[in-house]
Amino acid sequence: MNLPKFIKDDERLFRLLLGDLFPSLELPISEYGVLQEAVEAELSKSKLQKHEFLMQKIFQFYDSRLTRHCNMLVGDPMGGKSTAWKILAAAQSTLCKRGTEGFQSVTPIVISPKSVELDELYGAYDLATFEWKDGILSTIFKQCSEDEKPTEKWVLFDGPIDAMWIESMNSVMDDNKILTLINGDRIPLTTSMSLVFETQDLRVASPATVSRAGMVYIDAAELGWECYVNSWLDRTFESDEETKELHKNFFTKWVDKVLKFRELSCQQPVPVSDFNAVVTLCSLYDSLCKVETSFRKDSLGGDYASVAEKMFLFALVWSIGATVNDGSRKKFNACLTDIDAIAPATNTAYDFYIDVAKNDFIPWDNRVPVWRPQKTMTFHDMVVPTVDTTRNSYVTDTFMKSKVNVLLIGNTGTGKTILAQSMLKDLPDTFSQLVVNFSAATTSS
């Protein structure tokens, strides 16, 4: 039960220590048989890669669940934590449907504990009527406890762990397996129920909490962004091996070098992980392919490869390169031109967009509309289009048309609100708008 907690280097050291202490003992190799076949089938069904590291973590989670009713999946975002439990749950459910002995179907119930108040999570007395009102967790526990079906109920806590809410779970996590509420209710954890905590780290978790749970650490660096890209290529170019290979070469040529340069030589006001940056790159390229209707392989013919690489470079600039500050943009552009002269030599790649018909980079200046204020406009309604507003609007609009979430980041007074408001005004009637102001004091109610 110790190996799942270690990073790769520590795992190697641990095995060497075991070899020194028990020189004549060989660790048995676990075989999972039908479960491994089911896991591989679910990965293929979900268009995911059968990565050795991911499968290892899935089986470690499975082994940990056999011995503990409470387990923690720990690791950075986009590292495969959710994928691990989802694939295992689906595989077990599939085996149960086939009638395979020893496996039950799984019903996962996901809770975000930090998104609600403590009273909303566990329950509280109404101060006006002094009546008890169950919270989200107590309601779920009662429903699962009363359910006599053999189906496994996994109660998943997705979010940061801290003493504010986790300490009340200690009696459930230990051998007592009882949730005790402040009104005196004691809800037992049945044999078909188990707890799973999915969190980034355990910095503020007490030793008492950590010691009560099985631990599986999933290192996002071990999985790497290449795994995601391969799955994206399989989904996007499923029936076109030639185009898939072309785009795979784009990633090989550009992405790794650019990511390393960004980490070593550029400053990011809001640091974004390599994995998230590559996910954004794939999303933006997908969105550009949908928005730019003239970007079609059959219509472009022999120019397709050239246009596709320019489009890929544009998406790379506004995904991986979008997080660097103004002072680092020239450095970032120099990195691009060092890799290939396809990148614009004058100004920076941030100053150009792609004209698919001309197969060339065109300055954003050419796309800035001529604007004159209307007599009826008030001063606060006037938004003078510039290169910045034009290119930011284009990228934002491209994402929105493809229903991809957008996050605008910048200092106060840089035009984020104006950009968002102007985009909302131009949305078609198929969209509805809701403006919500958030602050540190905002609650779930």
Task: Tell what function each PLM region has.
Residues M1-S445:
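Conformational switch/transducer regions in large eukaryotic molecular machines and scaffolds
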